[in-house]
């Protein structure tokens, strides 16, 4: 390939990348969507309204409908999972400091997950009965929750991958017996 062809190919790639970057910058952040009978959990494939506790909704590029999660922990796992490599536009979670009812936080409690404070490692579990990353709009509300329920207050980026991607209800120190396994 001659030098002119190489430079032309590089210029074409640069223009394409630039156009994609500009397109991504122009994507408008959607508003949170109210839960409805058609809100189905991404992983559990169950109606979200059947589960108690905080929820998450994730909005993706070129998808007019949010992806629902019956637990905030599952939404964070989706964001961090290497298999789920979608371009995210917005992530909303329930502000449990504003929720009048733990079981059903309400559609007026959605906040941007990037701005939330999370309590991890508390005695409270999520809608699927597993450990939860409990979101709050204010650090003071999260700290008050910790006083009553235990745990630690962190930001979204500080939640350990192992907390959301690791196994639940399994003693990780337990050795698995390979007796009888095909080797």
PLM regions and their residue ranges:
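Cys/His-coordinated zinc-binding microdomains
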Residues: 45
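Thiol/selenol-based redox catalytic cores and closely related redox-interacting motifs
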Residues: 92-145, 152, 156
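C-terminal motif of bacterial Sec signal peptides marking the signal peptidase cleavage site
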Residues: 16-19
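Short cysteine-rich clusters marking metal-coordination/redox-active sites
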Residues: 41
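Bacterial signal peptide processing site
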Residues: 21-23
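Bacterial N-terminal signal peptides that target proteins for export
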Residues: 1-9
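Short, intrinsically disordered, charge-biased short linear motifs at domain edges
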Residues: 6, 25-33
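Mid-length scaffold segments of soluble, non-membrane domains
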Residues: 65-105, 109-110
């Amino acid at each position: 390939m001659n030098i002119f062809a190489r430079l032309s190919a590089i210029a074409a790639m640069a223009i394409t990348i630039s156009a994609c970057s500009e397109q991504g910058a122009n994507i408008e952040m959607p508003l949170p969507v109210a839960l409805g009978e058609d809100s189905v959990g991404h992983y559990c494939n169950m109606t979200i309204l059947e589960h108690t506790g905080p929820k998450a909704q994730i909005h993706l590029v070129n998808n007019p409908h949010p992806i629902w999660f019956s637990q905030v922990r599952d939404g964070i796992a989706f964001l961090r999972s290497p298999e789920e490599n979608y371009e995210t536009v917005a992530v909303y979670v329930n502000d449990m400091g504003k929720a009048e009812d733990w079981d059903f936080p309400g559609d007026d409690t959605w906040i941007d997950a990037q701005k939330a404070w999370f309590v991890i490692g508390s005695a409270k579990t999520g809608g699927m009965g597993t450990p939860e990353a409990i979101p709050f709009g204010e650090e003071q509300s999260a700290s008050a929750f910790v006083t009553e329920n235990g745990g630690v207050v962190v930001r979204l980026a500080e939640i350990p991958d192992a907390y959301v991607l690791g196994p639940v209800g399994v003693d990780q120190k337990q050795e698995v017996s390979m007796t009888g396994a095909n080797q």
